[in-house]
Amino acid sequence: MKKFFETIKNIFKIEELRKRLGYTLLLVIIYRLGCFVVLPGIDATMLAKLQSATSQGLVGLLNMFSGGAMGNASIFALGVMPYISASIVVQLLGMFVPYFRKLQTEGESGRQKMNQITRYLTILIICIQGPAYIASLHSQIPAQAFVAVNALGWSNFTYNMVATVIIMAGSLFVMWLGERITDRGIGNGISLLIMIGIVARLPYALIAEFGEKFNTTTSGGALFFVVELLIWFFVIVAAVALVQAVRRVPVQYAKRVVGNRQYGGVRQYIPLKINAAGVMPIIFAQALMLFPILFSRWDATRGLAATLGNYTGFWYNFIFFVLIIIFTYFYTAVTINPTQMAEDMKRNGGFIPGVKPGKKTVEYLDNIMSKVTLPGSIFLGIIAILPAFAILLGVNNQFASFFGGTSLLILVGVILDTLQQIESYLLMRHYDGLMKTGRLSGRSGM
């Protein structure tokens, strides 16, 4: 533990790292303040119905990603979701469209072009989602809440146009904040803003769960709450294991003599991640499962759509689980290219001991990926459906979302990624890092 705190002190001894952390903190504070700035012309005291509607289900998940801005009718209500949607679309285009696939191989210039395309697509998505969100406000909050319409005599059309422009500008500003953090701060800015939004909802969820369990008329509420926290801790540990787990494939490099120096002759490893797809399979699966939820609202007979639309029901979670496994294999197959890996290995004079270069190496890597993807996809599916089980066992909806799913994996993934970036700065300045073989180095002293 002493070593861990010494490492924390070392962080502030590095001027560049200190400035980057300060810059990141400043922009995060600006983002969080903006999440509480209500759209002009709306009475903030009349948002109870909107906050209730955005506290559960898929909308609740989106509200969590925005840090509660969606439920506050904030100028940052759309948050970074338009940018995330655009990034996913561009990423998919890079898998199937030759032009985008070519851009991915052009290094920094190709990356800049793809970033520019992502920005343009973000603006297009904002132009669609902005008016849709303003229209949803009219159905979620009472007409008296629109002060600009009632007191100033504005028409609904005029107010909607002004509010839409403000919402769109707010979302573009959030995108800019994320890019500034990436360039001049620490971590991936967009991911960090999502993580901050999720963390910001955690105290509210804990307070709500604490209140329910301690105000219950039945005995054992306090004990149940403690058990919940213990289970939650083990789920977090499992999520960390899923994000960090890799299968190391040994690679031997042949010796080369250039001039008077000898190169190669060392053994390295290719780290094949157990969950190479990250949270993308959950996002794709949730996008598909949104359709039965939407159709169930108009299904008066409570038939098939209503059955599949029950996100705590058996069939919803069974199909959700199967879709995650399918999408994990699909996304891993299109993002991990064994042929390219084998060619790069051969070009650099490397080979896998006991495996012939070329086709045999491709088959070996493909076989390894298939084997490690199966347990990874099943584990990912289990974590994704844990919130539904938590709700069925009596956990509050808000707190249940932290028991697994996209929010927990994003939380764990972004924190680990940020720690690894800080680690690289420390190691470059010859300080002990925060992490050691994927674990916090300070643990060894506990």
Q: Model-derived features: where do they sit?
A:
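N-terminal cationic and glycine-rich segments that engage phosphates or anionic surfaces
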Residues: 1-104, 109-446
